[in-house]
């Protein structure tokens, strides 16, 4: 992964388990991304308003449809716009290794490993329209 191209991308990681959140942060920072962290929906909205992310990565407990609603809520209340991709980690409902697009720039994924997630994030960040 080219760290230089990632240095301007901010990824907001929403994860309720400290160890998992810290692990995701380390992996993303090693790839050169700037990372902001949140424990829950409220924390994520505040963080996104302070420093708008280029992508939101949500991995919190709950049924997949509930987590997707929360992720969209974060994007809406932080006034980020639909061009900010939302990626929801899902441990159920879809087959391992799959990625499902649901709605405008919202994806559910259950990666087999970090390399699959890394590839998805890089692709989505490259697809973001550049503001004029």
Predicted regions and their residues:
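His-Asp phosphorelay/catalytic-motif detector in bacterial-type signaling
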Residues: 52-54, 79-87
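Acidic, metal-coordinating helix/loop segments flanking the phosphotransfer/catalytic sites
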Residues: 37-55
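Conserved phosphotransfer microenvironments
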Residues: 58-75
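Non-catalytic signal-transmission and effector/linker regions of two-component phosphorelay proteins
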Residues: 1-18, 76-80, 109, 113-132
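Alpha4 helix (beta4-alpha4-beta5 surface) of REC/receiver domains from two-component response regulators
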Residues: 68-69, 88-119, 123
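Short beta-strand/turn micro-motifs composed of small residues
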Residues: 15, 58, 88-92
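Accessory recognition modules or surfaces
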Residues: 1-8, 23-24, 54-57
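Two-component/phosphorelay signaling modules centered on CheY-like receiver
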Residues: 17-36
């Amino acid at each position: 992964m080219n760290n230089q191209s990632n240095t301007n991308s901010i990824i907001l990681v929403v994860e309720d388990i400290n160890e998992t959140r810290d692990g995701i942060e380390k992996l993303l920072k090693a790839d050169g991304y700037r990372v902001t962290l949140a424990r829950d929906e409220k924390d994520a909205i505040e963080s996104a308003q302070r420093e708008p992310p280029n992508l939101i990565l949500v991995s919190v407990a709950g049924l997949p449809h509930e987590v997707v609603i929360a992720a969209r809520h974060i994007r809406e209340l932080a006034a980020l716009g639909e061009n900010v991709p939302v990626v929801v980690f899902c441990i159920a409902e879809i087959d391992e290794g799959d990625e499902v697009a649901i709605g405008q720039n919202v994806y559910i994924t259950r990666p087999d490993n970090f390399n699959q997630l890394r590839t998805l994030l890089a692709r989505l960040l490259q697809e973001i329209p550049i503001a004029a």
